[in-house]
Amino acid sequence: MGPPQYSLSFDQFQQYAKKGNLVPLYREILADYETPVSAFAKIDHGPSAYLLESIEGGEKWARYSFLGSGAPAVVYEEQGDLFLVQGARKKRIASRGNPLERLREIMESYRPITVPGLPPFVGGAVGYLSYDMVRTFEDLPARQKDPLNLPDFAFLLTDIMLIFDNVAQKIKVVATAHVTSKGPRAIKSAYRSATERIERTIARLRR
């Protein structure tokens, strides 16, 4: 058995890394008897993960299902302030008007690259906006006490995505490489980290 075949060689990866700082790298495997739900149970997703099933027209199962795992960044709003959680670090971002604008500012630091062979969706900020977010835009009466004490919105950015092709019965295991600088050492480290995450994920799927 030869070495794993990734979607981009290191030389190709270097070229894409010149254009942005988030480069998706993937390896394709056969789904065999795996389903999105069974894969979700196997991977090390912790508290931050999602499974998106594709439906067309409300009843037709679409081609792709998406499973996101591993959250290097979580952004949520609480009492008008934003909090950015990266690993063990939690940073409070003071409120300055619309919290969605603060979220936009955070997202502007990420410059994703589009590579061939992937569907339009390969990750990004995935989460929810609560009903009470309407108070950000409209002058409404004070809301009642929230017994659940949930954030008004929360989004996570995952660095591993499983893309199930329900037609071809294949899985693309995608790792998003975050290139922190344009130096050769940083690019090489980002590529190596992405391949290692891909292989760890595949190993968990094959247990």
Residue ranges and their predicted role:
Residues G124:
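Catalytic beta-strand/loop module used to bind and position nucleotide/cofactor moieties
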Residues G2-A49, S54-S95, Y131-R207:
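Extended accessory regions or peripheral subdomains of proteins
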Residues L52-E56, P116-F121:
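Short coil/turn segments at secondary-structure boundaries
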Residues N98-P119:
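FAD-binding glycine-rich core of flavoenzymes that anchor FAD
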